Amino acid sequence: MANAYKQAGVDIEAGYEAVSRMKKHVQTTMRKEVLGGLGGFGGMFDLSKFALEEPVLVSGTDGVGTKLMLAFMADKHDTIGIDAVAMCVNDIVVQGAEPLFFLDYIACGKAEPSKIENIVKGISEGCRQAGCALIGGETAEMPGMYSTEEYDLAGFTVGIVDKKKIVTGEKIEAGHVLIGLASSGIHSNGYSLVRKVLLEDGELSLDRIYGRLELPLGEELLKPTKIYVKPILELLKNHEVYGMAHITGGGFIENIPRMLPEGIGAEIELGSWKIQPIFSLLQEVGKLEEKEMFNIFNMGIGMVVAVKEEDAKDIVRLLEEQGETARIIGRTVQGAGVTFNGGKAL
């Protein structure tokens, strides 16, 4: 039977066209250490130029979760790749690692070349923001597994750090200052609840502007996750950092303790930073308790850094010179977990 694979739902020619379209975007991410080009069986990266005493490779992998469903609804696919990169590289930079390269995995029901190109365009933009090379990936057309409009997206990154410069959090002491770096919005966590609260139960429209939002709801919800790599690497060159936490699923309450040693807790000063209107809208429409909000969402802070008190103001200044909005949001204390405003639990 001629064209049997195509009749089974897999269009090889469309796959070839997608690869051809994405090449120009991938090329913009290249670093001098990359060996070979797109299309090889494996991506290669030369580590011989790194003058580190004890080089350690740090890896991370993640996906975008159900934020993808918002991209499907809005038929907007050129920024979701930034989210995939951000979720991976932010996780490894908190250990002091410079992201070197990234690989993506796209699984779809139908390989539409223009859609795949837009996804990879976003991935490439994320890689440029993080300074890492997109050295490979896989696009799997899987009819019957996904509908023709659906796809899943995941990524994998590898970074490098000198062993003596790994940021572990083990030297954090009571009295260290916590600096928060502003998020761009919801980032890439909690979207199952977001959809239920705002779209299913609240019946809000993606095309309308609500409350104090400055953008239509769909655009607000699809804002890409902020990538903190370059400002954090600049910070590490200039100051000692004792611990860092990427505020993802689990919010403040789950993620800040991940960087703290036993016997040390975090006390957060509510009101010390701006909480974006999208979080207020979610809490109001969903009638969500404040504790639940801080246990699910980043609440306006995407990264938390622990530093000595005497360095805090200089570090805030450096981060703001790097284009970040940074605020002192609390400090470490004797104890455990996360409390708010004078030691109260929410």
UniProtKB/Swiss-Prot annotation:
Catalysis performed (reactions): 2-formamido-N(1)-(5-O-phospho-beta-D-ribosyl)acetamidine + ATP = 5-amino-1-(5-phospho-beta-D-ribosyl)imidazole + ADP + phosphate + H(+)
Pathway annotation: Purine metabolism; IMP biosynthesis via de novo pathway; 5-amino-1-(5-phospho-D-ribosyl)imidazole from N(2)-formyl-N(1)-(5-phospho-D-ribosyl)glycinamide: step 2/2
InterPro entries attached to this UniProt entry: PurM-like_C_dom (IPR010918), PurM-like_C_sf (IPR036676), PurM-like_N (IPR016188), PurM-like_N_sf (IPR036921), PurM_cligase (IPR004733)
Location, primary (coarse class): cytoplasm
Keyword Ubl conjugation: no
Keyword terms, alphabetized: ATP-binding, Cytoplasm, Ligase, Nucleotide-binding, Purine biosynthesis
One example of a Gene Ontology biological process annotation: 'de novo' IMP biosynthetic process
Single annotated GO MF: phosphoribosylamine-glycine ligase activity
SUPFAM superfamilies: PurM C-terminal domain-like, PurM N-terminal domain-like
Any Pfam family the entry gives: AIRS
One Gene Ontology term, aspect cellular component: cytosol
EC number: 6.3.3.1
Transmembrane helix listed as a keyword: no
Compartments, record wording: Cytoplasm
Family: Belongs to the AIR synthase family.
Name of this chain's protein: Phosphoribosylformylglycinamidine cyclo-ligase
Highest classification ranks of the organism: Bacteria, Bacillati, Bacillota, Bacilli, Bacillales
Gene for this chain: purM
